Structures are given as C-alpha cells and as structure tokens.
C-alpha cells in the first residue's frame, strides 16, 4: 500500500513539473505580442484543448477516463425492462423484473404530461441540442452570487444518466481516482452522450425514452408503472394535477413522495402548476382551481409475485432459465412478452376450489388432532425433537449460532422470545395475520397446516390450463405440484395399462385372495416374506373383472398383475406415458405406488390415456416475443404414440368404471359433475401409507385434472380414512373445479364423450360385462398403499419439508362404509 501511494505521489509530482514546463513554453511564444492577439490565442487554445479533452474522454485515451457508450450502444440501448407474462386468454398475469418498467410510446401519454415535464425540468428543451448553455451560465451565476442553485441538467442529460448509468455502470478511469476530478469526468460523459442522443433521436423520442427510464420512487420505473402505482390509471388518462405530482417527484423522489410526504408533495405539485402557468399551458383560473384539489392516491406497489398463478409463474421462470442463458436474454431485464398456456378464468376457478376445500380440510385436521401434536411415527407415537430439528435448519438458527458460538443460552433465549410475526391464516381474505410468536412457536404453528397442489391439462396438447402449487406462495415457496410424493393407487393406471398392452381386457378376471412372496428388504439386507393386503386387511376370495378391481382399488389384484406383467415393463410403460421420476423397478410394491413421483408428471401421464395413447410433453409457454416485437420462441407441437390405441381405449373404460362400478372409489365426483351429462368422466383415487398423501386424478376427453393433499412433512397427516382418503380430500378440489368449468359457457369446448372404438379388433365384450357385487360391506379405504412388510429403503430427507417416506407400510384400519359416502 505504501509503495502504491509513493508511486501516485511521484506521478503527480512529475505531472506538475511537466505542466509548468509547458505553460512556460507557451508563455514564451507570445512575449511581445499585442494583448488582443494573446486573448484570441488563449481562447482558441482553450477551445482546442476542450475539444481534444472531449475526444479523449469519449475514446478513453490511454484508459484515463473509463469507457463511454458509442453510437452503436446509443442506437440500441439496453434498458432494464420487465418481462410480462400473459395467459392464453390474453390477460397480463404477472411480471418478472428487477426494475418494474414497461415502456410506452409517445402517443400513449397525455400531452399535458409532456408540457408539465418540459416546463419544470427543461424549459428550453426544444431549442438546445442536449446541453443548455444558458442554463449552465445561470446556474454558475446563482452559485457565485449565492442566490440558490438551479438545475442545469437538461432532459437529454438526465436521460443519458438514467439510461447509461454513467455514474455506476461506466468507470471514470485512472484520472477519476484523483479527488475532485471524478465528477468532472462524469459530467463530461453526460454532455457527450446527450449530444449523441440529440444526433440520433428526435425530441419526441428523447421525451419518450426519458419517461420510460426515470425512477418515480416506490419501485416504479417509467411513466406507465408510476401511473399505475400511484393512481391506478394509465399514462393516457393522467390528469394535469396527477402529472404535476409525478413531475414534481423527479427533483427528489423520497422528499416529494405523495405517499410518504404528502405536504411536501402538495407544495411541489403547486410549484409545478405555477411553472405551467408561466409558460402559458394553463390559465390562472385553471391553476388556482387545480391547486385546490387534494392529493388522492390509489397507491399499490406492484411486486414480482402479485397477481394470479404465482407457482405457475415460478415454474415458467425455472423452465425459461436455461433458454434465456442459451439465447442471450435476461428474464428480469430483457422486456420479453411470454405467452403461456394457462387460462386466467380456469386459474381463478382452481384457486377458488383449493381455498374452499382446504379451509374444510384444515378445520377437520385441527378438530381431529385437538391439542395433540400431529407429528407422529408409523406407530402413532409423537416424534421427539421434531420441531427442534426443523428450527435448526432455519436461517435464523444458523445466524444465532454464528453470533453466539459459545453461548447456547443466548441462542435459546432468542429462539423462544415472542415477537410480532406475520403468518398464514384461513381466517381472512388476505390469508395473513400478525401474532406474537417465538421462532419455535412460529415453526410449530406453520407445520400444522395441510397443503395441496392442483393441475389441469389439455390431453390433446399437454398445455397446462390451471396450476396451483400450494395454499399460499407468500408463506410457502416450495411448489407442491412438483413435490416428490408416493402416488398410492393412482399408480395402478400403469399396472393396468401394461396389462392391456399384454392382451388382457377390463372383463378378464382375477381373484382377490391372500398370497405372499419372498422379497429383498433393502433395510435389513435380507430376504423377507411380504404379504400385500387390501386396505381393510380383508380378502373377499372372489374372482372379479379387472374393471371392478381397478374401480374398487383392490390391492391384491394390482400386486398379482404386477407380478404377471413384470415390474420393469410396468415402469417402462409409465416412462413412455410421461413419468420422468426414477422408479424402483425391483420392488413389487411399485404396483401400489411406492415410488415417489410428482403431480405434474402424473397428470401428464393420465393425459396419454385420454388422448387415445398419444403423449404430449407438458407445455407451459406457447411463444415468446422480444422487446422489439420479434417472435423468438414457439413451443414445438409434437406427439408420439406412447401406448396402443386399443390399450388407451380400454383404460378409458377402466377409468370411467371408477365412477360407474358398485363401490367405485371415484363415485362421489358425480356430486359435482352430474349435471354435465354431455361429457364422459372417469377417475382414480390414491392414498399413500398412513394417509400421508391423498390424490385424485380426473379424466374427460378434453380435460384432465389432478390434485394432491398432504402435510408438508409426511409424519403430519390424518389418522383415519374418514378424513384422510383421496376421495375425501383431493377429489373435492377436482370436483369443485370441474363443476365451475363445466357450468361456464365459455368452456363448452371441454364438453364431450370419449370416441367409440376405432379399432375393429375392439369388441364390446372386452369392456361390457357384469359388475362385481361384494358379499360384504366394502370400505372407503380402498385406494391406499398397504404393505405389511416394508420392502423399500425410503429415507427421511432432513433438508427439505417434502421428503421421502418416514415409516413402514401397515394395514389401515377400517374406517367408514361405502354407503356412508
């Protein structure tokens, strides 16, 4: 450091010496010359020096002044502009931005705003060429005489500063490190850029660019966002007094902010109105009248996650991350227009359905557990240190342990000291309340909420039409539609599809009976005897059609089919139909849905059946348009025949059997869609071990829906099927959504029947056969994974809330009769 200072001091000393030599040489040139010639020579020399200085700054001579934008950069400015997300029905559903800015044209702004701006910020705007020399002289005079400073920067200079970030983005070079010279170099660059801007653009373009780039405070960049933020209006509809408020803020956005400092804003607004009067743009009567108007705001600060479909928008951001990197775009600054598949009306129906059903589920969950702690192991015992383990994974715990490394008492004190904290609630429309809770208590409060996800998809395109990732994005950012959970009996779709692939039909029969088999237990590292059982632990001993076994979700038949068809082949079929998560191809329990998958891929796979065996990749974005209006991305429209038409047709019949067969687990869907008699519906419920995960998948020819319900941690769940089964929790979400969509005339195109068989090899005898009627009372607990001996190595993942399974499969007790539905 000392050597560096000595070098700088030495350089400065040499520079002073050389400067004195040059000045002495220059002085000697004019010894004996008349004074007027000396004056001219000095003036010309200063002018040439100034021009050379400007050129040196512009080209960054010897890296002394730092880089400046060239003409190419000025003609193609890179303003940070928000990217907008549009729904399929052309509704703006959100933005991605660092600076919330949406450009507008000159014509889209009220002309009085331009007059207001020029009268206040740059009264000689139309007569100068970027630099107002009269203004400079006036500012210098005021500074010398002490009569108060006036601004000398023109609108063009302010644009140069705002658009090209001269004071931050571009360095000031070596000379800029010398005290006092940095501001001179910065102002010089602003003059140069302002002159270039005047050469490249007309005056209206400069005004437009200025209004689109300037910061109006409160996170509002540009006139369009400012008009919306402060007045909930458009630039075209701004009144004169509103324009005066916005222009007045430009002098100091905090001091004159109408929200935070209304008195200052009022005084500044009135001064701006006086400026307009002085320049003849309003009359004295108009000025006095406008001054009497109180400031009335409709203040709303737009945030990244305001509006609909927050989880969907986050999914879009994740999907486009790689595309943006590969194509040179920044999702948050490039001003892209992203057109998505989602329908804003269907999204509203989905969010309403989730809210309505989850309020009921949460109330049931609270009443069900009462004052007991709901985090229990597979034996129903409270898990020790459950909350403490979660607290230790929180950032606040890591901060406190770093601050007090040798003082655990201080850490415990702060973790257990109550303080006001905003938490989620179903008790108000804002879904938020403030409670006095400690860190420990807030964690305990939040983990008791039940969660959900919902997806609606078009089977003919793979386009997602509605997407709910959880109950509140503000409180839980993790998207449950992509969470890995056990699908339970919803996975049986693939078991029976492979059975159809291998020549079986819905009317072929299998017996519901006890059997056992030797399997490898990865935990014990030995072979064990595995006895798959039905949800109620009872086998009928009867032979039944496959459509009845599927509709009633008989586990023994599904496992037996899994062994007949081959687990690996079932997994291959699942992959072809749209499952991307890795499946345990060695576990017989895969037939009962023991491998984790997510709702989005499961919904996509069910679409394959609905679209006659054709698989379409899940699509969130249809096209992207850049800031210049050029189409830079169009979603590919491809499909492949994943399974045969015959298998798909027969599985359509199987899914419909879930609503039509006696004891079908999806029968309660009729309570929601019964009036839509012009549409075929089918479905499959699913519930994983201990009711930790509840599912429902609903299909119709033109729309497929899926819902998941469960705790954030698998150890948090209902204890009984009466409350925790997929038919009681997830199915109503799908039902409420379908009810709204089917009753809306705008969605008539989603009505319809499945086609009659196109394959002459398909006969009615394959799927039209007598139903199976049980000789005993069946239970609702027929959609659960029930395996007496755990044959999977499923570990608890401590670093995430949604994790793998936490306990052994065990038989679920009989809870409720089907006739109670």
Positions of the model-derived regions?
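N-terminal type II signal-anchor transmembrane helix
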Residues: 2-86, 124, 144, 361
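Peptidoglycan glycan-strand catalytic modules in the bacterial/periplasmic cell-wall system
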Residues: 6, 79-289, 311, 472, ...
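Active-site SXXK
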Residues: 116-118, 276, 350, 461-462, ...
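Short, well-structured active-site flanking segments
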Residues: 126-136, 221-223, 283-288, 500-524, ...
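Conserved catalytic neighborhood of penicillin-recognizing serine enzymes
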Residues: 145-171, 236, 300-311, 504-570, ...
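Non-catalytic structural connector segments
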Residues: 148, 283-341, 345-409
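A penicillin-recognizing enzyme superfamily signal
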Residues: 340, 344-360, 392-458, 463, ...
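Mid-domain, small-residue-enriched loop/turn segments at the edges of structured enzyme/sensor domains
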Residues: 524-532, 564-604, 613, 617-618
